[in-house]
Amino acid sequence: YVFYVLLVGLSPWVSIPYSDSTALIIPVLMLYLYTNVDTGGFKNVKIACFSFLGVLGYMIKPQTAILFISVFLISMVFIRLRYIKKTVKYLSIFLISILISYFSIGIFMSSNNITVNKELEISYPHFVKMGLNNITDGGYLSDDAGKSMSFRSTKERKEENIVVIKERLKEYGIVGLLKHQIKKTLVTYNDGTFAWSQEGNFYWRVNEEKSKIERFFRNIYYETGSNHSIFKYIVQGAWLTILVMQSLNTFIKRKDMDNNVRVILLSLIGLFIFESIFEARARYLYTYVPIFIISGMIGLNGFMDWMKKR
């Protein structure tokens, strides 16, 4: 709870109505439904709700689908053949719920009277291209963004992105790409504030202070504030502690690891792969902070159990 308060509850990202904070509850809520699917009844409803959250989360923040996929993969790999009939039943509910959720959300979106120009879409190749740039170590690069937006059609944009991707991979080579990946990982994982106040022209407008409370919080959260460095040190320490505790999961023996733990670890591995492929931003981890904290606690408990058995 302390880590959650420090990294999520007190994080200024909570106050930003953007996809990261909006989708914050989805991965942990999906994990809750998965870990409690066999308790308290209503299993079919829980599976349907899980499927709906997976589709909704993907549409808000694609990274949330990683935990969704992890649950599916673990469930399939560790399937019990003696329960094959029930498995087919629940899998059918799962797939049907996905289809219903997808089309229902699609109908809702199409009825909002907002016309979307598909030719202005920035697709996945753009973010792969940006993730390979060596100027910002895989982070946001205005030149890449401007180049992609200069094309009038999605087809032209994708073709240019793919050409640049191939060029950058060729320039790096295997060793160069590995070095780039190390730098990119630091960009993504080495900031407990999750890149607060570090993106573009961060403050569009700063209003005049009207109260002492306002001044108090500005001193904490604004990078020019007198207490901002203290805030950064505290959350950075909390974040690094979680990462260290998460690494302690290596002390958990395979026979002592249940599917719940497997889902958590696989989802975080999947998140790492996702961030390694696409544009690097520390903020993109924010939605998974609750999962990181749970993983850290599991790792700490596993390490303590390992120490007791020595």
Task: Name each region found by the language model.
Residues 67-99:
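Perimembrane helix-loop-helix junctions
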Residues 28-49, 76:
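Membrane-interface transmembrane helices that cradle and orient dolichyl/undecaprenyl
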Residues 1-6, 258-262:
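Transmembrane-helix signature of polytopic, membrane-embedded enzymes
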Residues 39-45, 79-91, 245-265:
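Membrane-interface helix-loop-helix junctions at transmembrane boundaries of multi-pass membrane enzymes
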Residues 46-62, 72-73, 93-98:
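Membrane-interface alpha helices of multi-pass inner-membrane proteins
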Residues 110-211:
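Membrane-proximal stem/loop segments at transmembrane-domain junctions that anchor or position
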Residues 2-29, 34, 60-67, 284-289:
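Multi-pass, polyprenyl lipid-linked donor-dependent membrane glycosyltransferases
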Residues 187-264, 268:
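Membrane-interface anchor segments at the N-terminal boundary of transmembrane helices
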